Amino acid sequence: MTVATGEPADEAAALPGHPQDTYDPEADHECCERVVTNISGLRFETQLKTLAQFPETLLGDPKKRMRFFDPLRNEIFFVRNRPSFDAILYYYQSGGRLRRPVNVPLDIFSEEIRFYELGEEAMEMFREDEGYIKEEERPLPENEFQRQVWLLFEYPESSGPARIIAIVSVMVILISIVSFCLETLPIFRDENEDMHGGGVTFHTYSNSTIGYQQSTSFTDPFFIVETLCIIWFSFEFLVRFFACPSKAGFFTNIMNIIDIVAIIPYFITLGTELAEKPEDAQQGQQAMSLAILRVIRLVRVFRIFKLSRHSKGLQILGQTLKASMRELGLLIFFLFIGVILFSSAVYFAEADERESQFPSIPDAFWWAVVSMTTVGYGDMVPTTIGGKIVGSLCAIAGVLTIALPVPVIVSNFNYFYHRETEGEEQAQYLQVTSCPKIPSSPDLKKSRSASTISKSDYMEIQEGVNNSNEDFREENLKTANCTLANTNYVNITKMLTDV
């Protein structure tokens, strides 16, 4: 049972221990004040406190959104994409959750995020939600001279001299590869035999004739070509190393590792030839040295990967394979299981056949691999009915196994391909000529050739353009002496004059 006292409400509120609730009508009015936003004729209504959660954005900053205010209709007017604003408004209402509508393309929604100035964090959140792979930062050296040298050797499209250096590097790589292939022709290759003459014993290794008292390999044309190529590769590698922004990160780059692998075999081979002594030239040691030299010289073929530094296509392929390692691992795992199953099955299916081509399960591995990959050399074939059934199932299983991860790999390739082409389109020369009062920005002087620019750099350039336009618009509100060709801007001064 509740008992009501006879004390007035005001007196009870004034007693000690009773909190006094103060009511501020103006604060409550500001809290509940609503604002209307018109997006190309579609009107949205929300509270100001909702927009004020993100004061750095276009709608959250009163000064920024006032540029688009229409005093006649008492609303904010934008000529923007209407379906995108549902997600933009929900970003304010939910406190920072951003999700692209399914009927809005990626590029359009990205432009809307930049226009409403939701910030870098919102853009990164959106990109992660869409499955974009975060781009690695590519810092530049702080020293001006090192920066110029680094751009000259690392970014072929940064300037004309950089292109010339890239062309020279590609030509040297091609000459080295052609020389590596031509020296194996029979007309250039010497047989491994001992030649005795003039008291000097010679031993030939691969294409080089090595003399213990007087070497003739240094006059070999292929050796001279190889030496010239190595001189260029070494010079290029050392210049890159001394100009790089991070010495520790330099050796973690796969391209620099390829450069090292392309150079080291020459010096190992040269050192082995020079260190050879006549008393060590026994047959066993000669065969061992020959095998080692052949393996080392085989590593030279990896020099072809140096072309990927100057080829966007090879870079895209490498990035695709790197991003698809999980799918490729699953593919190899599935193939491994299939090889074990079908090689075992075909062995037991052909076990009773006297002329069976599958003497053991390991011998059947090769047949299972070429069958599952739909190559089918025909060097090993089943002859019994059971073996042919197993072979048919093996081929069908191979097709299905290989086809499953292919769409994911193709999707990754399309992503990296479009990212590279988009980066080239975004790195165009930006120049604003609509009004002489627009301040020039040094960030706008980016040539189209700078296709290596990252998306973060492009967003900074875009932000610089927006800031320049904002400064001009604020001046335009005061002077009204210049017209800016922008459909998203409402000239309040002109509107009031017309009224």
From Swiss-Prot:
<dbReference type="GO" id="GO:0008076">
    <property type="term" value="C:voltage-gated potassium channel complex"/>
</dbReference>
<feature type="region of interest" description="Tetramerization domain">
    <location>
        <begin position="1"/>
        <end position="125"/>
    </location>
</feature>
<protein>
    <recommendedName>
        <fullName>Potassium voltage-gated channel subfamily A member 2</fullName>
    </recommendedName>
</protein>
<dbReference type="GO" id="GO:0005886">
    <property type="term" value="C:plasma membrane"/>
</dbReference>
<dbReference type="GO" id="GO:0071805">
    <property type="term" value="P:potassium ion transmembrane transport"/>
</dbReference>
<feature type="topological domain" description="Cytoplasmic">
    <location>
        <begin position="244"/>
        <end position="254"/>
    </location>
</feature>
<feature type="modified residue" description="Phosphoserine">
    <location>
        <position position="434"/>
    </location>
</feature>
<feature type="transmembrane region" description="Helical; Name=Segment S5">
    <location>
        <begin position="326"/>
        <end position="347"/>
    </location>
</feature>
<feature type="topological domain" description="Cytoplasmic">
    <location>
        <begin position="311"/>
        <end position="325"/>
    </location>
</feature>
<keyword id="KW-0597">Phosphoprotein</keyword>
<dbReference type="InterPro" id="IPR028325">
    <property type="entry name" value="VG_K_chnl"/>
</dbReference>
<feature type="topological domain" description="Cytoplasmic">
    <location>
        <begin position="418"/>
        <end position="499"/>
    </location>
</feature>
<feature type="topological domain" description="Extracellular">
    <location>
        <begin position="183"/>
        <end position="221"/>
    </location>
</feature>
<feature type="modified residue" description="Phosphoserine">
    <location>
        <position position="449"/>
    </location>
</feature>
<keyword id="KW-0325">Glycoprotein</keyword>
<dbReference type="GO" id="GO:0005251">
    <property type="term" value="F:delayed rectifier potassium channel activity"/>
</dbReference>
<dbReference type="GO" id="GO:0001508">
    <property type="term" value="P:action potential"/>
</dbReference>
<keyword id="KW-0965">Cell junction</keyword>
<dbReference type="GO" id="GO:0042734">
    <property type="term" value="C:presynaptic membrane"/>
</dbReference>
<keyword id="KW-0449">Lipoprotein</keyword>
<keyword id="KW-0813">Transport</keyword>
<feature type="transmembrane region" description="Helical; Name=Segment S2">
    <location>
        <begin position="222"/>
        <end position="243"/>
    </location>
</feature>
<keyword id="KW-1133">Transmembrane helix</keyword>
<dbReference type="GO" id="GO:0030424">
    <property type="term" value="C:axon"/>
</dbReference>
<keyword id="KW-0472">Membrane</keyword>
<feature type="glycosylation site" description="N-linked (GlcNAc...) asparagine">
    <location>
        <position position="207"/>
    </location>
</feature>
<feature type="transmembrane region" description="Helical; Name=Segment S6">
    <location>
        <begin position="389"/>
        <end position="417"/>
    </location>
</feature>
<dbReference type="InterPro" id="IPR004049">
    <property type="entry name" value="K_chnl_volt-dep_Kv1.2"/>
</dbReference>
<feature type="region of interest" description="Disordered">
    <location>
        <begin position="1"/>
        <end position="27"/>
    </location>
</feature>
<dbReference type="InterPro" id="IPR005821">
    <property type="entry name" value="Ion_trans_dom"/>
</dbReference>
<dbReference type="GO" id="GO:0032809">
    <property type="term" value="C:neuronal cell body membrane"/>
</dbReference>
<dbReference type="GO" id="GO:0014059">
    <property type="term" value="P:regulation of dopamine secretion"/>
</dbReference>
<feature type="topological domain" description="Extracellular">
    <location>
        <begin position="382"/>
        <end position="388"/>
    </location>
</feature>
<dbReference type="InterPro" id="IPR003131">
    <property type="entry name" value="T1-type_BTB"/>
</dbReference>
<keyword id="KW-0406">Ion transport</keyword>
<feature type="site" description="Important for binding with the scorpion mesomartoxin; when the scorpion mesomartoxin-rKv1.2/KCNA2 interaction is modeled, this residue is close to the 'Y-57' residue of the toxin">
    <location>
        <position position="381"/>
    </location>
</feature>
<dbReference type="GO" id="GO:0043679">
    <property type="term" value="C:axon terminus"/>
</dbReference>
<dbReference type="GO" id="GO:0030425">
    <property type="term" value="C:dendrite"/>
</dbReference>
<dbReference type="GO" id="GO:0016020">
    <property type="term" value="C:membrane"/>
</dbReference>
<feature type="modified residue" description="Phosphoserine">
    <location>
        <position position="441"/>
    </location>
</feature>
<feature type="transmembrane region" description="Helical; Name=Segment S1">
    <location>
        <begin position="161"/>
        <end position="182"/>
    </location>
</feature>
<feature type="transmembrane region" description="Helical; Name=Segment S3">
    <location>
        <begin position="255"/>
        <end position="275"/>
    </location>
</feature>
